[in-house]
């Protein structure tokens, strides 16, 4: 938001005053910065965050993974099919309930973690934001994510 002097009034319809626009541009640009780091590994940003989640907790249902990543099944299903084709994950139907699909990392899915280990540091080296400012921003963004996920439609 731009600073205003005493003679100006806040314009709620000004593009520069839109939090959603600032978040959109930052998200788009950060993903653009990730692309040259991920492409050599055959990953997209979405497949990368999927792996990050699975490295934390493997053998989860598609529903759990979608909730964790804030992705709907229309986005997640083709992504998981592609990742399975790359040999990074397997999809297994539940024994008792055939509708439940479990996602597990393969040996390759676990091994690629080592190749991704320096990506966060490489991103920090691009001087996007120093750690002192990143921590409170991350807390604020998590609060926004929580609020949005729990807000009535």
Predicted regions and their residues:
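Charged, amphipathic alpha-helical coiled-coil/dimerization segments
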Residues: 81-139
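N-terminal leader segment of winged-helix/HTH proteins
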Residues: 1-41
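Alpha-helical linker/hinge and terminal dimerization helices associated
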Residues: 26, 30-33, 69, 112-130, ...
């Amino acid at each position: 938001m731009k600073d205003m002097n005493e003679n100006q009034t806040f314009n709620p319809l000004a593009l520069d005053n839109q939090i959603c626009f600032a978040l959109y541009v930052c998200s788009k640009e950060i993903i653009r910065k990730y692309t040259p780091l991920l492409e050599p590994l055959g990953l997209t940003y979405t497949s990368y965050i999927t792996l990050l989640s699975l490295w934390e907790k493997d053998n989860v249902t598609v529903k759990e993974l979608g909730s964790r990543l804030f992705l709907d099944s229309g986005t997640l299903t083709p992504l998981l099919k592609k990742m399975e084709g790359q040999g990074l994950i397997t999809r297994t139907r539940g024994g008792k309930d055939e509708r439940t699909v479990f996602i597990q990392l393969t040996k390759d899915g676990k091994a690629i973690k080592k190749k991704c280990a320096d990506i966060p540091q490489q991103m920090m080296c691009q001087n996007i934001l120093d750690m002192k400012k990143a921590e409170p921003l991350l807390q604020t963004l998590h609060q926004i994510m929580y609020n949005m996920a729990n807000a009535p439609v």
